[in-house]
């Protein structure tokens, strides 16, 4: 069975266990997946994740998600606002919008992602709305400009680049090139100069020759972002990428990954340093270590202060003056 039928596994097993049961094959097909199951979850009591979309109509050469999750589909704005209001009524302070391809929201309802963001932005009692990973070709100037004017939408963008080489992007069958990606980042910096910009990159894909990786590295070196999320390419059966003959050894993938992670560490440290002495709106989430508690600012910066149980789940404005590093990475205090 596929993801759509996973809740039917128990009934199938029960049927098999009956004395009169006959052997049968149950086979789910992704083209039969049409419904959207609204869901939300929480990693702690202040931040909640609201799934607004599922599935994907893109067919990147290295990816199996469309086969596993089916076509792009979503809940209605009205149903998602209702769920978000329930989250806030239960004490949620921050909502993160998630999905497989959230920028494609509206395929099944004829609505637009920016209109969903506008509707959620009006919910009384919600402190912060954060957008998770969104494709660069779907991250419109209209959406960026709205984020710049909103008091609730966090100035935090997570954008999958995958490669800074146009040759590799073509082999991946991505729907943009490096020029469009640069334009998106530059527009963010014009209207939200201090925004956090996280970028996904895959290294060692089939077809990533040394010169293409160097193109990617230099593209990122010149780009004003905050942090990289680096992934080493792994083969997926049934993908068209397997038809590309040129492969990268595991050792070379590791070397390339390490170079990008060092670049990311340097960029992230500089980003934290830029915020020293600047006020941060922090939602306090949990205990940290050595008598400290941890929270995230609107810029997705980790901030710590002396632990106070009564402050967990509240928001306060602080001005950090120290950049420190612990087991969990950089944080401000």
Model regions and ranges:
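Proteins enriched for Cys/Gly/acidic motifs involved in redox and nucleic-acid/cofactor modification
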Residues: 1-104, 142, 157, 179-190, ...
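Short flexible coil/turn linkers enriched for glycine and charged/polar residues
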Residues: 42-46, 56-57, 153, 163, ...
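Terminal RNA-binding accessory module
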Residues: 243-333
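Short, hinge-like loop/turn segments at secondary-structure boundaries
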Residues: 17-19, 113, 147-149, 216, ...
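Residue-level signal for inorganic ion chemistry
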Residues: 9, 97, 131, 159, ...
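Conserved SAM/AdoMet-binding glycine-rich loop
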Residues: 89-213, 221
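Radical SAM enzyme [4Fe-4S]-AdoMet core and its adjacent flexible, acidic
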Residues: 105-125, 172-175, 235-266
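Glycine-centered loop/turn positions within well-structured domains
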Residues: 7, 58, 103, 137, ...
């Amino acid at each position: 069975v596929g993801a759509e039928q996973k809740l039917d596994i128990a009934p199938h097993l029960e049927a098999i266990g009956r004395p009169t049961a006959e052997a049968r094959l149950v086979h789910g097909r992704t083209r039969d997946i049409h419904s959207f199951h609204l869901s939300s979850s929480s990693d702690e009591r202040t931040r909640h994740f609201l799934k607004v979309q599922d599935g994907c109509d893109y067919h990147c050469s290295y990816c199996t998600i469309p086969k596993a999750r089916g076509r792009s589909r979503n809940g209605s704005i009205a149903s998602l606002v209702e769920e978000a209001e329930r989250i806030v009524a239960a004490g949620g302070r921050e909502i993160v919008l998630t999905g497989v391809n959230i920028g494609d929201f509206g395929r099944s309802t004829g609505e637009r992602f920016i209109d969903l963001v506008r509707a959620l932005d009006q919910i009384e009692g919600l402190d912060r709305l954060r957008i998770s990973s969104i494709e660069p070709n779907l991250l419109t100037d209209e959406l960026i400009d709205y984020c710049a004017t909103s008091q609730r939408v966090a100035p935090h963008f997570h954008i999958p680049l995958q490669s800074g080489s146009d040759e590799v992007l073509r082999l991946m069958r991505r729907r943009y090139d490096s020029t469009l990606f640069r334009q998106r980042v530059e527009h963010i910096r014009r209207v939200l100069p201090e925004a956090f910009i996280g970028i996904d990159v895959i290294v060692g894909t089939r077809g990533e020759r040394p010169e293409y990786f160097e193109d990617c590295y230099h593209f990122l070196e010149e780009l004003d972002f905050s942090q990289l999320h680096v992934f080493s390419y792994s083969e997926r059966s049934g993908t068209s990428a397997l038809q590309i003959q040129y492969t990268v050894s595991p050792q070379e993938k590791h070397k390339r990954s390490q170079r990008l992670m060092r670049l990311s560490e340097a960029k992230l440290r500089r980003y934290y340093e830029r915020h020293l002495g600047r006020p941060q709106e922090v939602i306090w989430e949990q205990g940290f270590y050595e008598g400290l508690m941890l929270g995230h600012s609107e810029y997705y910066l980790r901030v710590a202060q002396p632990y106070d149980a009564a402050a967990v789940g509240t928001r306060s404005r602080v001005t950090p003056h120290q950049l420190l590093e612990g087991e969990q990475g950089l944080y401000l205090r």
